[in-house]
Every structure is written in structure tokens, then in C-alpha cells.
Design a protein with these regions (language model features):
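Solvent-exposed edge beta-strands and adjacent loop segments
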Residues: 2-78, 117-135
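Acidic-aromatic/histidine active-site loop/patch
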Residues: 138
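Extracellular/virion structural assembly segments
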Residues: 55-118, 132-135, 145-154
Length: 154
């Protein structure tokens, strides 16, 4: 018997950020609004070849480290209009280095009981285009340390 799966939608994700605070978890996070495209965080493994002559023709790999990245695109307000506070945290971190370029983040799907939290190095780049294109920016958050589970308050 086939089971029907009702798919989720990418717009179920919510991203919240906070300026980096020397590793101390902030008490206040700011939601990033205007997201039009989002790739949630997912661990990827660094694999190293650990095969030897005894394995014959078969190779073997083992994971030696984990990393993660998330990215997205946001609509950017016109000049002179109010900026989105969450986007502003990403923009300021995106033009800074070392600790000033880090942000705390939380990412969770609507209706989910757990999400992700961590610290990431941020990039934020406004895009160009033709005269009729909307102003958008791309952001990337590259993980620094553990991608931890996050349980939101009920």
C-alpha cells in the first residue's frame, strides 16, 4: 500500500539572527524578513580516503569533520525606506571580518518542534540586474562550530 506524503514548502522556514556576542547566547534574536529563496542548514562531511592495499579494488572513505552552510535571497527596500533590522544585522556582519563578521542564528520551520541554532560567518551581497529587476541581496551563513538543535518556546 502506497503512503501519500504531503510535502512541506520552503517558505515554512523562519530565520532569526543576532549580532555576535563573544560566544554568549543572546537573549534577543531578530527575524529576517523579505526572504524569497532559502537553503536551510545541512551538515556535510569531510571525507578522507582510508582504503589500503588489502581492500582490493574497493575504495573506502571515512568522515573526519562536519561543516554546514545556509543561504538565501532577500528583497531589499528602496533607498530612503526603512531597512529590515534582521537584514541589517546580516549586512553589517557581511562587510566585517573576524568576530565582527559573525552572527548567531536560529532557523526553524513553522509547526516544527525543533530547528537549528549556531554561530556563522555572514556574507551579504546586493545584486544587480536589468532596469526592471527588483533589488535583492544574497546572504550566506557559513557555520563556525556545532550546528545544534534548537527547541523554540511554546
Amino acid at each position: 500500500m502506497a503512503t501519500t506524503i504531503t510535502p512541506g514548502i520552503v517558505s515554512d522556514w523562519t530565520l532569526e539572527v543576532a549580532a555576535y556576542t563573544d560566544g554568549t547566547t543572546p537573549t534577543t534574536f531578530t527575524r529576517v524578513y523579505g526572504i524569497t529563496d532559502f537553503t536551510p542548514p545541512a551538515p556535510s562531511k569531510n571525507l578522507e580516503d582510508d582504503s589500503d592495499f588489502d581492500s582490493g579494488a574497493w575504495g573506502s572513505q571515512t568522515g573526519t569533520g562536519l561543516s554546514y552552510e545556509m543561504s538565501g535571497t532577500v528583497k531589499v527596500p528602496r533607498a530612503g525606506l526603512a531597512v529590515d533590522p534582521g537584514q541589517e544585522i546580516l549586512r553589517l556582519a557581511g562587510k566585517s571580518v573576524a568576530e565582527d563578521g559573525y552572527v548567531h542564528f536560529r532557523a526553524i520551520k513553522k509547526g516544527a518542534t525543533t530547528g537549528y541554532t549556531g554561530i556563522a560567518d555572514a556574507s551579504f551581497t546586493e545584486g544587480g540586474g536589468s532596469r526592471t529587476d527588483l533589488t535583492k541581496a544574497e546572504f550566506t551563513l557559513s557555520g563556525r562550530g556545532e550546528l545544534a538543535d534548537y527547541t523554540p518556546a511554546p
